[in-house]
A protein has these predicted regions:
Chain A
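Structural recognition of an alpha-helix C-terminal capping motif at a helix-to-coil junction
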Residues: 52, 66-73, 86-98
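Arg/Lys-rich amphipathic alpha helix in sigma70-family domain 2
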Residues: 80-84, 97-115, 141, 202-204
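Helix-turn-helix DNA-binding module
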Residues: 149-161, 165-186
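C-terminal edge and immediately downstream basic/flexible tail or linker adjoining helix-turn-helix-like DNA-binding
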Residues: 2-20, 112-122, 126, 141, ...
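Sigma70-family region 2
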Residues: 32-33, 59, 72-87, 106-108
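Residues within the DNA-recognition helix of helix-turn-helix
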Residues: 46, 190-193, 197
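Short, charged helix-capping/linker segments at alpha-helix termini
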Residues: 32-41, 51-70, 208, 213-214
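Short helix-capping/turn signature of helix-turn-helix
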Residues: 45-48, 56-59, 164-171
Length: 214, 250
């Protein structure tokens, strides 16, 4: 009865799910015992996080889709090893980061894609002053997104993962260190270095060229 | 705290990753330094831009396709025949990670074996060479030559020249290393090596001719001075009391 109720809670937002650990634990138990319906529920409630992080790590939708598929297969395979006192989504993030690293190593395609994106950003950055007057805010926002994507592309893989988890996902430094299997000091150093590089990138491509400042 | 130090800490300060004490010091500096305050503002703006790093809105069809593929794969895995599992099990040893581990273990084992083999192989001949060199030295010491105050021992029964040691055991065995004091103060100064030799039948110089057929114990000590050598001969029956007592010193 409880499980039926649980399966009907499909429309719960992700942040509510993270607070309702009992409900999630129930789904996990059922999935471990081979219930694919329960596992599908787990996928539904974590797919957005996995896809988003994969896209941020890899830079394109096709790779993000492949990464998400591999992540969920690994989650299903190793769900029995998941400890109930762990944070499930931190565990999923850890798998996602590992999968994205594997995919990036195998394909080496994301570098070229980011590089082409970076070129686009550079070209568009020169056009920013012309857009100042009567600017279309949406277009500026798009350019800023491209700019920040270009900045992320310049980061080494470990720094990118650290700053994604810390500044965008908003995880505490210790949690980031646990996900990346590193020390807090190392993560802090990576984050500091990444922030410096992003600031320098923004200076070069936006602020010093008379672009928009938020 | 100067500007250089603050510049290093600013990336962590804007993300609130600094400890309270350091953060307070940076904040205090920012109030008085316009340059650093401007830099801090830029870090903040870069951080705001970072929040724009959003992926495009994925359609529900995309998510559904991912889930369907995952579930299909899980279904396929669950219906995999046992023979495929067996093949997977057989294939596992040839996976790169396993192969690396096995290769490393083999390399370590071979290295250890080679080390012990070489160590044993080189120590054996070395020890033999040392023993032979010691033997040669002692032979030199035993052989009468020039002005050395060597004892003249009776030769063999078959009439060899007296003075030659009839026989020296093949492997002279060092019994001890003693310290011979030559100074009045008794300060240990000169190492003296002693060696024991078994001689065969001796005669002539021994006062008691009846003992010529007895074994003679020769104890030789070489001081650091090559001109001084102490040699003791012992005949077991010379002293009636104890056969171990020395009978003659040269």
């Amino acid at each position: 009865m409880l499980s039926e109720i649980a399966l009907n809670r499909n429309d719960l937002p992700v942040n509510v799910l993270s607070e309702n650990q009992t409900w999630l634990q129930l789904l996990i138990k059922r999935a471990v015992s081979g219930d694919t319906t329960a596992f599908e529920q787990i996928m539904i409630h974590s797919q957005q996080r996995v896809m988003t992080l994969s896209w941020r790590m890899l830079g394109n939708e096709a790779d993000a889709r492949d990464a998400s598929q591999e992540v969920f297969l690994r989650v299903y395979k190793y769900l029995g090893r998941f400890k109930q006192d762990q944070d499930f989504f931190a565990w999923v993030y850890q798998i996602t980061v590992n999968v994205c690293r594997d995919i990036a190593k195998k394909r080496q395609r994301h570098t070229e894609r980011f590089a082409s994106l970076d070129t686009t950003v550079e070209e568009s950055a020169f056009e920013v002053p012309a857009l100042q007057e009567g600017a279309d805010e949406a277009l500026i926002a798009a350019q800023q997104r491209e700019l920040i994507a270009g900045a992320m592309a310049t980061l080494p893989e470990k720094e990118r993962a650290a700053i994604l988890l810390r500044d965008i996902e908003g995880l505490p430094t210790d949690e980031v260190a646990r996900i990346l299997r590193s020390s807090s000091t190392t993560v802090r150093s990576q984050i500091s270095s990444a922030r410096k590089k992003i600031k320098i990138h923004c200076e070069r491509h936006l602020w010093k060229k008379g672009g928009t400042r938020s | 705290m100067n500007c250089k130090n603050v510049e290093e800490l600013l990336p962590l300060y804007v993300g609130r990753d600094l400890e309270e004490k350091s953060a307070a010091m940076v904040a205090s500096h920012l109030q008085s330094c316009g340059h650093c305050a401007h830099s801090a503002q830029e870090y903040g703006e870069a951080n705001q831009l970072l929040q724009l790093f959003e992926p495009p809105q994925f359609s529900e069809a995309t998510y559904t396709a991912v889930r369907s593929r995952v579930l299909r794969e899980i279904e396929r895995e669950s219906h995999k025949p046992q023979t495929i599992f067996a093949l997977e099990f057989l294939r596992r040893p040839f996976q790169p990670r396993f192969m690396w581990a096995v290769s490393t273990a083999l390399l370590l084992a071979v290295s250890l074996f080679a080390y012990y083999f070489i160590a044993n192989h080189t120590n054996g001949p070395q020890e033999r060479a040392d023993a032979e060199s010691r033997h040669d030295k002692l032979k030199d010491l035993a052989a009468p030559s020039g002005n050395d105050p060597k004892p003249v021992l009776p030769g063999k029964k078959n009439g060899e020249t007296p003075g030659a040691i009839a026989k020296i055991s093949h492997k002279p065995r060092f019994q001890q290393t003693a310290w011979h004091s030559r100074r009045a103060g008794g300060t240990p100064a000169v190492p003296v090596r002693t060696a024991q030799y078994s001689t065969t039948e001796s005669k002539g110089t021994a006062p008691n001719t009846s003992l010529t057929s007895e074994k003679t114990l020769r104890l030789e000590m070489q001081t650091s001075d090559s001109n001084i050598r102490i040699i003791w001969f012992s005949h077991p029956a010379t002293n009636e009391g104890s056969p171990n007592e020395s009978s003659k010193g040269i």
